[in-house]
Structures are given as C-alpha cells and as structure tokens.
C-alpha cells in the first residue's frame, strides 16, 4: 500500500492490456495473400493433420491461419480474409480464415452451422 505522499509524487500506473491478435491492428478482419498452404500436427493428446496457411497481411504482418471445415481450395497466392480466434491445439495459430469470401470457397454439402462456413442453402 502506498502512502498518500507517494501517490502525490507518482500516480498509479494504468494496467495495459495485451491484444490476443496483434496482426489485425484493432480491425475485425484483415485481407491477406497465402504464401504457403500446408498441414500441421496438433499438440500432445490430439492427433490429426490440421490444414493451415501462412498469410501475408495488408498490415505487413506474416501470420499462420487455420483453414476451418472439410476440404478447401486454397493455394499459394490465394487472397483470403482473416478473423481473430486461436486454435487451442496448434501453437502459434491465432487466426482463422473466413470461408466463402474472396478466393476461399465455402464448405460443400454443409447443412448445419452454414453461416460459419460460407455454405449456401441446400436445395
């Protein structure tokens, strides 16, 4: 506990919050170009081949982003839209690619949670 005299001398420091997605620079989404599309293996208890892409953003950052859903059409030089949101079992992956925008196609034959995967209404 500081004394009143200490508080007069120097005021209390404000706590600064560290952002969880610095590459977005306070924007909800960011556009970028894929520099590499590959698969990655998750952390210890899980086992899979998760689809990820290295993306160079318009803000100048180069980040790793997760490609959600089953199957994708992304390749090098594809223009994608990124949102925040980490993948818990992939270290260093703090962003998600938004399906159904720009060069990213929506998930085919998706019936539930369609809006999250850019899928149109099934006939």
From Swiss-Prot:
One of its GO terms (biological process) is translation. One of its GO terms (molecular function) is structural constituent of ribosome. The keyword RNA-binding applies. The keyword Ribosomal protein applies. Keywords: Methylation, Ribonucleoprotein, Ribosomal protein, RNA-binding, rRNA-binding, tRNA-binding. Gene3D superfamilies: Nucleic acid-binding proteins. It comes from the Bacteria. The modification 3-methylthioaspartic acid is found at residue 89. InterPro entries: NA-bd_OB-fold, Ribosomal_uS12, Ribosomal_uS12_bac. GO terms for cellular component: small ribosomal subunit. It holds the Pfam family Ribosom_S12_S23. Belongs to the universal ribosomal protein uS12 family. Part of the 30S ribosomal subunit. Contacts proteins S8 and S17. May interact with IF1 in the 30S initiation complex. With S4 and S5 plays an important role in translational accuracy. This is Small ribosomal subunit protein uS12. It comes from Prochlorococcus marinus (strain MIT 9211).
